Amino acid sequence: MTTTYDDPRRWWALAALGLAVLTLGFDITIMNVALPTIATELEVGTNGLQWMVNAYVLVIAGLMLTCGALGDRYGRKRLLLIGLGLFGISSAAAAWAGSAALVIAARGVMGLGAAIMMPVAFAVLAALFGPAERGKAVSFLVMGLGIGIPLGPIIGGYLLQHFWWGSIFLINVPIAIIGAIAIAALLPESRDPSPRRPDVLGAVLSTAGLTSLVYGVIEAPGRGWSDQVTIGAISAGLVVLTAFVAWELRVRDPMIDLHLFARPQFLWASIAGVLVTFGMLGLLFVVPQYLQFVAGHDALGTGIRLLPLIGGLIVGAPAGERLAARAGYRVPVSAGLAVLAAGVAIGALTDLQSSYGFVAAWLATAGLGIGMALAPAMDAVLDALPTEQAGSGTAITMTLRQTGGALGVALLGSLLAEGYASRVNTAGLPPEAAVAARESIAGALAAAAPRRDPQQPQRLTTEQSTDLDEGSMKVSSTTLWWYPMGV
């Protein structure tokens, strides 16, 4: 393996990697603030919006471990350049897509590029930095990823305020070009001299199982939970995931070393990380829609009003670390989950008369819980692993968290969609408006908007508009209740 411990260019290479990782982070959530605009522009329902979010995260979760192994075998610099190329090209395709199907497909390819870059970016640090500096370099990349996730809605809001919705994807293109040039010039090639064989079948089984399972969850509100397609998709997903577990237990070089879960600390810390990511990404799917559709804020205003969540996270992270040093990992992780659940439960009390101060308070509370739990949970995972398994154990945890985020969006979004059919009052609306109102929040708010065309005989009344707004608010708050109940 080529090393460049004394090469001053290594810090510039780290900066390029940090920029790429920051982009991967905010691309996980940048879609959320744009969902209302995309729903209107492309006439997309809730199911389609969920797949625009999940296509990216789910591909990352399914392919991250395999892509990391490919980097070890074929060269990490080469894989990084391939990942950046896929990410940049698919971002441009998504920006100019004219249909929901094309956006979803492009997001899937973006996820493939991210799945290549995320593990390889961390693995390549071994060729750049010696043991004394490596911890600082790893922290830099982790910080970039952590800041990028909550930063996504703010960047997205600013872009939507000044440009069209495709700009949230187009911003990735120059970053990918700059990153590719910097990596090609500054990064040495490195590979594992004795790499493990890639677990292709394991990757296929895990991706197919998760995709089928989440597809069933997303489709259930529209088709019904007893529908054959819903039952078939969920059942197939569970069967394939069971086969995945059986395969991983017998294959020589498994994608996931399931024996790690026999370590209690690794198990509970991994579950805690999944719960936190589930709640964070699920929250970032539901709340922007409330802020735009119900509270009436524009895209940038929505992003800015999510800042209390980031503020709580920034305060909670060091507090959790200090508490872990004094009382062990379980205390801050358990306390963080409790604070997060409490914040979301308070958020479920939000109604049409709630002030933004109330919303900001419970968002900050939820962010505080996320910050308190997330870093100590990762520290607990690393502490439970022997040194020789630190890399694979970290990759497992990252994959599980990405999967938890995808399921958070799917399950909370599924509950959100299901509520419209039963709780939004469309009595007295014209047939087309009633169908649109039951399909999604975008349709409900479009139907609720007073029609100013004097030639239109079926003008909505103030009472009808209020009923639809209240229906949207009720189903949003009911959806938020499910997270603290689950925790």
Give, region by region, the residue ranges found by the protein language model.
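Transmembrane core module of solute transporters
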Residues: 10-60, 144, 164, 171, ...
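Helix-loop junctions on the cytosolic side of multi-pass membrane transporters
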Residues: 181-200, 246-255
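Symmetry-related core transmembrane helices of the 12-TM Major Facilitator Superfamily/SLC fold
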Residues: 169-183, 233-239, 483-487
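Hydrophobic alpha-helical segments of secondary membrane carriers
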Residues: 140-144, 272, 396-401
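Short helix-capping/hinge motifs at transmembrane helix termini and TM-loop junctions
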Residues: 98, 130, 186-189, 221-222, ...
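Juxtamembrane/transmembrane-helix interface segments of polytopic membrane transporters
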Residues: 36, 40, 94, 160-161, ...
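Transmembrane-helix bundle of Major Facilitator Superfamily
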Residues: 1-185, 319-320, 327, 348
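Hydrophobic transmembrane architecture of multi-pass small-molecule transporters
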Residues: 178, 380, 396, 401-487
